[in-house]
Structures are given as structure tokens and as C-alpha cells.
Amino acid sequence: MANKRNYAKELNILIETFTHEEKRPTLLLHACCAPCSSAVLEKLTAHFKITVLFYNPNIYPEAEYQKREAELKRLISEMPCTKEVALVDLPYVPEEFFTAVRGLEHIPEGGERCFACYKLRMEAAAKYAAGHHFDFFTTTLSISPLKNAQKLNEIGEALAEKYGVPHLPSDFKKQEGYKRSIQLSADYDLYRQDFCGCVFSKKEREAKARGEA
């Protein structure tokens, strides 16, 4: 069996290399929400010229989408380390999500439906990064203990090959990343949602709260 890759270590080695070479590459960072972005931005802004991409057609309902988008904008405007960070928000088209997960609606959270959602959002990031000549792209998603970092990186590497823009390896939950995101969320009084985003995860969460799952 092959050794499991340490994506957090791979990222640290890249950062050390860029620092030694006095390089600060451009990075398109797909962001799912403000809490997950907080610790990632704090870690990366000194080493990359970052543009944040908010593309999350999975989020339900639209009011929830708008709330998360507004919190991300507020975070970027308030963090001292994000003065140079740009934000791009792509149109909110929920049908893109439903098309991507068609036939997977009843698969439990954390399975193939989620992987299809990862790919949908990361592919939008890869396309944008390639079209705008970024040095790297990645996503904040791996900061969550509920997200499969190996799958995220495998998807990222496949998209890198497809679109010709390198994927930045990451497992942001490691090295106290998730713990730091909780602290920063408290520091900035960020809205922390209690479900991943889609209507299916919302229903699952509500069922668990009622003791039905």
C-alpha cells in the first residue's frame, strides 16, 4: 500500500521554496465561506498574491448564499492581512449544482454527491485560474474536518492536468488550522453556519436535530 500523502507538509515545502527564491506567486483561492477562509487567508497571504473566488451554487436557500457571501466580503475588508486580496464572485445559479449531483441526491453526506460538488466548484476555479493566468489554484474546503482532503487534492490534480494550471496541495485543517479558524471566527464575530450548504445537507441536519437520523 502506498504511503498516504501529507498535503500540509507538501504545501509547507512549497512555501519554504518560494520564500528562499523570493517569489510570491499568484493564487486563485476558491472560498466556501468566511469561517473556513479566515485561517487559510492568514496562513497564505504573506506567501501568495491572492484572489478569492466565491462560487458556491450548492448553497441553499438564496438568503443563506447572500449571508455567506456578505460575511466573506466583510472578513476580507477587516483582516489586516487581506488588504491586497481581491474578490471575484461568480453568478449564483443553483441549477448548476443540481445538474452536477443528479442521481446522487439520496447519498449520505460525505459521499459521492459531495465529491461531485467538490469537483463542480473546483473546476470553476481551475477554469478561471487558467483563463486569467494564475500560478496556482486551490480551495479552502480542506480546512473542515468533515471534508475529504485526499479526494479534494485528487480532484485538484486532475483539474490541473486538464486546464494547465497547477493545483496547490493543501490540508488546511492540519497544524491547528481548523482550531485557528474557530478562534478567528470568534475574533471577527463571523456567522458560522450549522450545515454544509446544500438543501440535502440542510435536511440531514434538521433530521438529526429531530432525532430521526
Name each model feature, range by range.
Residues L44:
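Aromatic pocket-lining residues of Rossmann-like dinucleotide-binding sites
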Residues M1-A39, H47-A213:
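Nucleotide-activated chemistry modules centered on ATP-dependent adenylation/adenylyltransferase
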